[in-house]
């Protein structure tokens, strides 16, 4: 272990696990030495990766709060703060953040999930200090002005109406998610329930920001044209004075084992029947993660995926089949969603789907399917890691969701090492028909 830095920053050095075995990409293994990780005295985790090919920087601030941290009456607050964080501080009034970043040639974005809220900034390296000052300022000193809150409340409520309430697929998915989880807060929609959006109080907002927007609840990623020592000194300059706060309350609830299939029938105006399946899966830190990710590609990853070939191209029982598994701090759901042709019998589709899943659980996958999935995973990985934005995103994912940024450098070999037996074991662990929730949307004709 390396000694603490002179400024009291705890360096986390050492060789990333598995990096030496990346013989197919030795330059990537060597790149691990360019990554530096430190923890400020106030608990802020900082990870920096020097990449000098272009004079730009990508900054990701991962705030460890999502809808899983919300409760009765406060659903949607994590997503709401994604909006509010661009609305000013005493030092930088509303609009300053975007104006100052754009003047330097920079841009920004943000997104919220069930587990995290992530703020992204991209800018020329000459604007590094400005970006850090703006980011630190809004984390510590965000203004909550009642008129601005009400305006953003209307925006978020309209967003919910557009993205969820007016969408048959999104409405069905929201209700399936809520039915699949009896206890765990993954049942809460990220955007929030309508009544909660309309009733948050200023006290709710202040308490939420004070609890979760603290340096010891954030992970800051910097990738690009930066010197690690200079970059860390600037992070300490702008973030270091913000005091740590009490650790947020942990999410202790674990979903009880599902004892039998649950079903939901949703009559809605529309043309196409929809069928959605939700199976209880695993957490991102589970060692079976590579196998389940590859299985996801085999089942629903593209036109050549197994379910698309069988149910769309060959049997023509669906016009589209998709799905996925959102990796989270806790075990989330593996979703499979199908859009059926107008007039299609959903029972006929379900019988065919069950036959395909039975075949998977009995026979597993063949070598060609697994090879295709590995090729896709490798191509996606290297395509992402070749940009500073991809590096920043992946560093954050591994640091926050997988528990250690160094696992990133072992990811290619971890995926390549997956066997057909590993995939079959993951399939049997997840695709248990007794532990699934099925939602069926039956289309209705519009009323006259």
Language-model features and meaning:
Residues 49, 54-80, 94-139, 170-195, ...:
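M16 family metallopeptidases and their MPP-like homologs
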Residues 424-440:
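Bilobed periplasmic-binding protein-like "clamshell/Venus-flytrap" ligand-binding domains
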Residues 9-38, 137, 177-218, 250-255, ...:
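Histidine-acidic residue clusters that define the catalytic metal-binding segment
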Residues 28-60:
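Mature N-terminal segment immediately following signal peptide/propeptide cleavage
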């Amino acid at each position: 272990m390396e000694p603490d830095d002179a400024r009291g920053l705890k360096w986390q050095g050492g060789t990333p696990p598995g990096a030496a075995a990346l013989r197919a990409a030795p330059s990537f293994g060597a790149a691990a030495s360019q990554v530096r990780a430190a923890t400020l005295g106030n608990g802020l985790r900082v990870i920096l990766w020097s990449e000098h090919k272009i004079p730009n920087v990508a900054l990701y601030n991962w705030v460890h709060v999502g809808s899983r941290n919300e409760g009765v009456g406060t659903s949607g607050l994590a997503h709401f703060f994604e909006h509010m964080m661009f609305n000013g501080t005493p030092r930088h009034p509303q609009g300053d953040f975007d104006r100052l970043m754009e003047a330097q040639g920079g841009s920004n974005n943000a997104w919220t999930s069930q587990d995290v809220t992530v703020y992204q900034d991209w800018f020329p390296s000459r604007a590094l200090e400005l970006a850090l000052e703006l980011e630190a300022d809004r984390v510590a000193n965000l203004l909550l002005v009642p008129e601005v809150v009400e305006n953003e409340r209307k925006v978020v409520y309209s967003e919910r109406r557009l993205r969820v309430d007016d969408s048959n697929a999104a409405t069905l998915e929201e209700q399936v998610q809520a039915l699949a989880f009896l206890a765990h807060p993954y049942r809460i929609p990220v955007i929030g329930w309508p009544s909660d959006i309309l009733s948050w109080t200023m006290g709710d907002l202040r308490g939420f920001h004070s609890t979760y927007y603290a340096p010891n609840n954030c992970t800051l990623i910097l990738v690009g044209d930066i010197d690690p020592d200079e970059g860390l000194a600037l992070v300490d300059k702008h973030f270091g004075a913000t005091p740590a706060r009490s650790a947020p309350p942990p999410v202790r609830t674990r979903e009880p084992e599902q004892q039998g299939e649950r079903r939901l029938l949703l009559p809605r105006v529309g043309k196409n029947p929809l069928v959605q399946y939700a199976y209880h899966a695993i957490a991102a830190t589970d060692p079976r993660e590579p196998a389940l990710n590859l299985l996801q590609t085999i089942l629903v990853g593209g036109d050549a995926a197994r379910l698309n070939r069988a149910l769309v191209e060959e049997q023509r029982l669906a016009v589209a089949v998709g799905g996925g598994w959102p990796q989270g701090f806790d075990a989330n759901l593996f979703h499979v969603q199908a859009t059926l042709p107008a007039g299609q019998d959903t029972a006929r589709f379900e019988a065919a789907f069950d036959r395909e899943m039975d075949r998977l659980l009995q026979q597993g996958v063949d070598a060609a399917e697994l090879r295709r999935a590995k090729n896709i995973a490798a191509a996606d990985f290297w395509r992402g890691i070749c940009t500073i934005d991809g590096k920043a995103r992946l560093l954050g994912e591994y640091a926050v969701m997988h528990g250690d940024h160094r696992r990133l450098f072992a990811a290619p070999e971890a995926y390549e090492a997956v066997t057909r037996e590993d995939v079959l074991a993951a399939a049997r662990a997840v695709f248990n028909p007794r532990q699934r929730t099925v939602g069926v949307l039956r289309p209705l004709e519009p009323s006259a």
